[in-house]
Amino acid sequence: MTHQTHAYHMVNPSPWPLTGALSALLMTSGLIMWFHFNSTTLLMLGLTTNMLTMYQWWRDIIRESTFQGHHTPNVQKGLRYGMILFIISEVLFFTGFFWAFYHSSLAPTPELGGCWPPTGIHPLNPLEVPLLNTSVLLASGVSITWAHHSLMEGNRNHMLQALFITIALGVYFTLLQASEYYEAPFTISDGVYGSTFFVATGFHGLHVIIGSTFLIVCFFRQLKFHFTSSHHFGFEAAAWYWHFVDVVWLFLYVSIYWWGS
């Protein structure tokens, strides 16, 4: 079956799933070493091997799809189903954080002072940096849609401009979030409020960084004429992921920043 022409997704043997798993082990172990022993050596090793794995894995996929023609319509259909299932799993991942937040906030225990936010916690003003962050992400959702429509219409220059704007807005969001964390009057160790706030918004911030990386790869691929109006699943998956990140932020803003304050 693997040595004859067919439309199905028969991947070649690859070392990258193994190196990716090992790099994930190094990163998680490195985080523990950093938290408990203030040593970043293992974490840096994990991040480096993870970046190398991602680069080489993406390179192989680009070669198979763009240059060798392995991504037939049947394969693209399977990849779309896979991306949809991945996003559904991410929705469930964030559902756990929202569950923890509402479980704690709707029935605050006597230890929290019987109120929410807990006694002694001064929440961030939802009409300052969080509102700006919301505007930035909503604008990036518009620009990524503009990029997609430009690609479908064969307008390469507009697609590149819109994609660049989206990436710039994603980086701006990350910088705003970092400044907000730096200036926050509470920390992750300040009870259940600090824990749910930093874990939920922190994982969302991580997803923004991942999505920005995904879009940067798409930007450089488009510079090399890799995408056409009929063959661009890599960009389409990145756009879906970015819209997912947008929607999660809206729920975070309404729940944690606005209602939770």
Curated annotation (Swiss-Prot):
Instruction: Give GO MF terms, alphabetically.
Output: cytochrome-c oxidase activity
Relate the assembly described in the record.
Component of the cytochrome c oxidase (complex IV, CIV), a multisubunit enzyme composed of 14 subunits. The complex is composed of a catalytic core of 3 subunits MT-CO1, MT-CO2 and MT-CO3, encoded in the mitochondrial DNA, and 11 supernumerary subunits COX4I, COX5A, COX5B, COX6A, COX6B, COX6C, COX7A, COX7B, COX7C, COX8 and NDUFA4, which are encoded in the nuclear genome.
The UniProt family comment states: Belongs to the cytochrome c oxidase subunit 3 family.
- Listed EC numbers: 7.1.1.9
State the InterPro entries in the record. Cyt_c/ubiquinol_Oxase_su3, Cyt_c_oxase_su3_dom, Cyt_c_oxidase-like_su3, Cyt_c_oxidase_su3-like_sf, Cyt_c_oxidase_su3_a-hlx
Q: Name one GO cellular component term.
A: mitochondrial inner membrane
Q: Which residues lie on this side of the membrane: Mitochondrial matrix?
A: 1-15, 67-72, 153-155, 224-232
Summarizing the function annotation, the protein's role is:
Component of the cytochrome c oxidase, the last enzyme in the mitochondrial electron transport chain which drives oxidative phosphorylation. The respiratory chain contains 3 multisubunit complexes succinate dehydrogenase (complex II, CII), ubiquinol-cytochrome c oxidoreductase (cytochrome b-c1 complex, complex III, CIII) and cytochrome c oxidase (complex IV, CIV), that cooperate to transfer electrons derived from NADH and succinate to molecular oxygen, creating an electrochemical gradient over the inner membrane that drives transmembrane transport and the ATP synthase.
Is Repeat tagged as a keyword? no
The protein's name is: Cytochrome c oxidase subunit 3
Tell me which UniProt keywords the record has, alphabetically.
Answer: Membrane, Mitochondrion, Mitochondrion inner membrane, Translocase, Transmembrane, Transmembrane helix
- State where the protein is found: Mitochondrion inner membrane
Q: Which GO terms describe its biological process?
A: mitochondrial electron transport, cytochrome c to oxygen; respiratory chain complex IV assembly
Show the stretches that span the lipid bilayer. 16-34, 41-66, 73-105, 129-152, 156-183, 191-223, 233-256
Chief location category: mitochondrion
Q: What is the organism of origin for this protein?
A: Litocranius walleri
| Domain of life of the native organism | Eukaryota
Describe its membrane topology.
Multi-pass membrane protein
